[in-house]
Amino acid sequence: MQRPEAWPRPHPGEGASAAQAGGAAPPTRATEQREPSLYTIKAVFILDNDGRRLLAKYYDDTFPSVKEQMVFEKNVFNKTSRTESEIAFLGGMTIVYKSSIDIFLYVVGSSSENELMLMSVLACLFDSLSHILRKNVEKRWLLENMDGAFLVLDETVDGGVILESDPQQVIQKVNFRTDDSGLTEQSVAQVLQSAKEQIKWSLLK
């Protein structure tokens, strides 16, 4: 997926010379605040149907402590758990979410963030989780496959930057990392078994 690029900032003196030459004026402060940013995701978290955290990752210092994060999550849950909507606005942030059986999945961005972009990340996360959980997107299966859930999240968002919005690509990368890990563990097991065999034969001689 092609990442959005921020507008280039003019070097000192470039804006004045451009204005004198009849060119476009340098961006104003209001314009600069609307510049696209790679860092579009503030947080992703999953809560159970009582509002308790199951999984969470925050990508900036808006909520620097775990206590502040938990208060925010509780406020978000109270605002969204009894509504049919898929989007909410709270504390200057845009929140998109989806519920499944007994869990709620949330993606948080700034108030100026593109809602469709956030929704695409939410859909990617949900579809990828549905695949690794064999369509059982619920608390029990999530807790039993937490490593896979974190892999899905890491392949979708990294440091607040959207890496991927295609669930098929995410699943492929997660499977590759899982297979690679499995091969490594198998190789270690084979080395240990070979060492045991060598020790056994040396003792028999």
Curated annotation (Swiss-Prot):
Coiled-coil segments on the chain, per record: none
This protein's record includes keyword Transport: yes
Biological role: The coatomer is a cytosolic protein complex that binds to dilysine motifs and reversibly associates with Golgi non-clathrin-coated vesicles, which further mediate biosynthetic protein transport from the ER, via the Golgi up to the trans Golgi network. Coatomer complex is required for budding from Golgi membranes, and is essential for the retrograde Golgi-to-ER transport of dilysine-tagged proteins. The zeta subunit may be involved in regulating the coat assembly and, hence, the rate of biosynthetic protein transport due to its association-dissociation properties with the coatomer complex.
Keywords carried by this UniProt record: Cytoplasm, Cytoplasmic vesicle, ER-Golgi transport, Golgi apparatus, Membrane, Protein transport, Transport
Keyword Transferase among record annotations: no
Source organism of the structure: Mus musculus
SUPFAM superfamilies for this protein: SNARE-like
Record's GO cellular component terms: COPI vesicle coat; COPI-coated vesicle; cytosol; endoplasmic reticulum-Golgi intermediate compartment membrane; Golgi membrane
Positions with biased composition (Basic and acidic residues): 1-12
Pfam families to which the protein is assigned, alphabetical: Clat_adaptor_s
Lineage: Eukaryota, Metazoa, Chordata, Craniata, Vertebrata
Membrane topology: Peripheral membrane protein
One GO BP annotation of this record: retrograde vesicle-mediated transport, Golgi to endoplasmic reticulum
The protein's name: Coatomer subunit zeta-2
Sequence segments annotated as region (Disordered): 1-33
Listed PANTHER family: COATOMER SUBUNIT ZETA-2, ZETA-COAT PROTEIN
Family of this protein: Belongs to the adaptor complexes small subunit family.
Recorded superkingdom: Eukaryota
Localization in the cell: Cytoplasm, Cytosol; Endoplasmic reticulum-Golgi intermediate compartment membrane; Golgi apparatus membrane; Cytoplasmic vesicle, COPI-coated vesicle membrane
Compositional bias segments (type: Low complexity): 13-30
Subunit structure: Oligomeric complex.
Alphabetized InterPro entries for the sequence: AP_mu_sigma_su, Coatomer_zeta, Longin-like_dom_sf
